């Protein structure tokens, strides 16, 4: 595990840590076209990225994610941008770090930057072609850039397999920053690759994660169920519950969720008290 963990320190002080909302969904509202990689906005439209960060901080987020979810070489290769991993992730972390500085200057409240690391989109051997060594190198390139840009923690998210979590965690640890990893669980109480919340809790201990939890999924109720499964394992690490506001639907040229702000506020209180 890493040394100092600012998220754990914040939880010890406040009792909880409030994270941000849906970065991608907010970008759609600002003109991002479906299929276009939001990571490129870190350099093309930094003012839009900064505005979303500022809005989350103004809403009370203690921690927020960088605009780098798909910022690894394998994902960026789909857009002929695999050679831009370093510059895009450094920019993502710098934009977020600058937002924390602006917020502190006006409010005196300290907030944290979580360097978002999403999945590669590839299957691991024997089901696919990606092996552990290759995956570690892909994730290391991104993790090092996020650390260089000023991330406080590295946030591995929306994973489905322990193999990919292991590779991303190994890579992230080379930075010396605290590492969080979250899986996405479905209605069967397991990830797409069959990992249960309790399995994941034990795995998190085995690979010495600093934080773990669940994110995304199909809605807050199901996410709370996964969170309870992790907590029931008796794990002593900070537990993350960061769900969708329901199932996203494409309507009238935009992404909509069937949940509401009130629903998410209630879910946040339930998650705090699990």
Predicted regions and their residues:
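Domain-level signal for soluble alpha/beta catalytic cores
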Residues: 1-274
């Amino acid at each position: 595990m890493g040394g100092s963990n600012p998220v754990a320190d914040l939880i010890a002080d406040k009792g909880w840590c409030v994270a941000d909302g849906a970065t991608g969904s907010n970008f759609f509202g600002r003109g991002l076209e479906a299929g276009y990689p939001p990571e490129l906005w870190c350099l093309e439209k930094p003012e839009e990225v900064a505005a979303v960060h500022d809005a989350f901080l103004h809403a009370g987020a203690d921690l927020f994610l960088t605009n780098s979810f798909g910022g690894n070489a394998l994902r960026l290769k789909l857009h002929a941008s695999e050679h831009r991993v370093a510059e895009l992730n450094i920019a993502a972390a710098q934009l977020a770090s600058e937002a924390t500085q602006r917020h502190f200057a006006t409010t005196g409240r300290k907030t944290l930057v979580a360097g978002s690391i999403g999945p590669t989109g590839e299957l691991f051997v024997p089901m696919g072609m990606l092996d552990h060594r290759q995956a570690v190198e892909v994730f290391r390139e991104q993790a090092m850039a996020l650390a260089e840009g000023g991330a406080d923690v590295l946030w591995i998210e929306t994973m489905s397999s322990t193999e990919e979590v292991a590779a991303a965690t190994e890579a992230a640890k080379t930075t010396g920053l605290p590492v969080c990893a979250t899986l996405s669980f479905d209605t069967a109480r397991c990830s797409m690759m069959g990992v249960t919340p309790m399995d994941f809790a034990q795995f998190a201990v085995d690979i010495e994660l600093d934080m773990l939890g669940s994110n995304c999924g199909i809605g807050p109720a199901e996410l709370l169920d996964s969170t309870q499964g992790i907590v029931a394992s008796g794990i002593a690490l900070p537990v993350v519950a960061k769900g969708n506001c329901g199932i996203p639907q494409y309507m009238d040229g935009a992404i909509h969720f069937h949940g509401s702000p009130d629903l998410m506020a209630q879910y946040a209180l339930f998650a705090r008290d699990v």
